[in-house]
């Protein structure tokens, strides 16, 4: 449950990180079930707080940004994502919204294959391009690799321009064989068939793709000029062109028939040749589809009825406390080994101690564990009926398991605030050098990783002791690059006070709070909890975090301040914000722009703007790209100033 705007923003950042790993790195950090749960909580918060919706929320976009390994290619028609439903009541509500307006509507149901979406463009009967989904508007051009997928026709008996879309998958049998080969070759194993399919499709060497035995299962079309009446007719036409037929495809008239087909699929799931994670439901009548239309992210005429995640019962025999990059302590349960979906599970995350307490999970409990193709399984609940008196309460740790410093215990999370804790040093330094902190050019996460590996740095102070010969030891560092980095590090001295405060990475203290603190002078961090509470916008958690952080890191902070000699203000930056035409203005971005909306949103926020996702009478500017839609009409109704992309760029250039 998301309770505050801060938690909401953190959830967006976390889900976007998961999406990046899932879509671009072929790495499922969490299970689909865990992601879905976190995503639904985000949607629920946005439903109650529509004016707070952020442009970079995963509810507002499809997939993830396209990586740089392959050339980008636009889709002729957008590739949409599907909304999920998880139970009978949610499905009933979705169906009722459609059947109330269109009582005669019917529904095509088909297995939801867990693979990689691919868009095939045919012109004059020839396959000319194959593009991954990407962000829905553009994806990676993988034509050479797609032509090595055996069941993708290189030519079809239709000369018009048509986009045929489907899922690239690897069968369970071929996945197992592939992982055995990789094991024998001492290569990293794929976590699941979806990751294997994605990694195989995106190989730079097409011969590797050819060996992976990928398959393409069609599920729809994009741009075309054919006059289909129904979705089923469209799918039949695709099969007639030589594509593989969809197994267990059915046409249904009501909720009961859909539920029957859903449960049939669940029964067939284990024996199905490929990995399934649900059932796709699509309105069959194309005229009804057109009238229902789309949300910002997904069609209103289709949904994915998700399967329950695979689960098993086992026993918790121990607890390991792991320290994350932010200092957050994550309890991990040590389990009696249990096999789930072909993998032996010995550990499962418990997320945080608040969740342990809420679920009343105890040491030696028998518990329900789920795993849906992910690496780290999740404990759902304890089986209290199995308790025999040997169970013990799982206590929150009081000191860090790595550095033994006293922990900051909040209602939900527990943190190690020691900046010198080895488990969080690397991430602390990445934040220290970031754009909103000391903005040290050239000091990214890969460089910091190398510096740690070479034992050249252990904390921020060590950065300023680096020498040219130290940096020359790093991979790909020549004299010029090394000297540029040394110059950038030295240039970061004498920063505005707020930047140095923000660079410390104090829990609950971001850019805005750092600017407020900076107004109180160089000794601001020495103040008491009561004094912090008197500051505008500061609550108990922020005040306690500041007090505890300073108590744990006094010597380090003083040394850092002495070395960097921060300025008490930064009038240049403040003047730029306050003089900006966008300062304190509410801005909405809509339509297709040449750059990602989030990139423009960041530029505008740096000039003091507030970014919103919905137009109202309180909106000051609407930035419009192509296909602006209803927001443009609403802006005109409310008398909102409208800027196109060219006008926006002209105004932004004034502040370069």
Curated annotation (Swiss-Prot):
Belongs to the NAD-dependent DNA ligase family. LigA subfamily. The keyword Protein biosynthesis does not apply. It catalyses: NAD(+) + (deoxyribonucleotide)n-3'-hydroxyl + 5'-phospho-(deoxyribonucleotide)m = (deoxyribonucleotide)n+m + AMP + beta-nicotinamide D-nucleotide. The keyword Magnesium applies. Its EC number is 6.5.1.2. The gene is ligA. GO terms for cellular component: cytosol. This is DNA ligase. CDD domains: BRCT_DNA_ligase_like (cd17748), LIGANc (cd00114). The lineage of its organism: Bacteria, Pseudomonadati, Campylobacterota, Epsilonproteobacteria, Campylobacterales. It comes from the Bacteria. Zn(2+) binds at residues 400, 403, 416, 421. It comes from Helicobacter pylori (strain Shi470).
